[in-house]
UniProtKB/Swiss-Prot annotation:
Listed name of the protein: Basic phospholipase A2
Disulfide-linked positions: 26-115, 28-44, 43-95, 49-122, 50-88, 57-81, 75-86
CDD domains: PLA2c
Principal location: secreted
Note: Displays 20 times higher phospholipase activity than blK-PLA2.
Cofactor(s) recorded in Swiss-Prot or TrEMBL: Ca(2+)
Sequence similarity: Belongs to the phospholipase A2 family. Group II subfamily. D49 sub-subfamily.
EC number: 3.1.1.4
Keyword Secreted: yes
Residues given in the record as Ca(2+) binding sites: 27, 29, 31, 48
Source species of the chain: Bothrops leucurus
Key words, A-Z: Blood coagulation cascade inhibiting toxin, Calcium, Disulfide bond, Hemostasis impairing toxin, Hydrolase, Lipid degradation, Lipid metabolism, Metal-binding, Secreted, Toxin
């Protein structure tokens, strides 16, 4: 669920998901349109695509099982939906960590009106 995703982000990046990732660029947070602004925003675009490929799942509310071992997120047992949601969230949290050095504070609370270009396809 979104709370678990937030905890993954915090552990991976050391940053609070709100406000650092909830309104970043064109794809972090609710919805998304246009072209991703940078590598961090692309993490959100890919995460949105990952959620979009799930069928009959509720990624924002379905809880899943995971742990961290030696700093690595391990998705645990559960339904196929729970496992897939966990893998989507894990990939995004790791992506955020890998792109911390290019994170731009100017893309926080980025206005949607500036995300007008045609959206990329997943």
């Amino acid at each position: 669920d979104l709370w678990q995703f937030g905890q993954m982000i915090l552990k991976e990046t050391g940053k609070l998901p709100f406000p650092y990732y909830t309104t970043y660029g064109c794809y972090c947070g609710w919805g998304g349109q246009g072209q991703p602004k940078d590598a961090t925003d692309r993490c959100c675009f890919v995460h949105d695509c990952c959620y979009g490929k799930l069928t009959n799942c509720k990624p924002k509310t379905d809880r899943y099982s995971y742990s961290r071992e030696n700093g690595v997120i391990i998705c645990g047992e559960g339904t196929p939906c729970e496992k897939q949601i966990c893998e989507c969230d894990k990939a995004a949290a790791v992506c955020f960590r890998e792109n911390l050095r290019t994170y731009k504070x100017x893309y926080m609370a980025y206005p949607d009106v500036l995300c007008k270009k045609p959206a990329e396809k997943c």
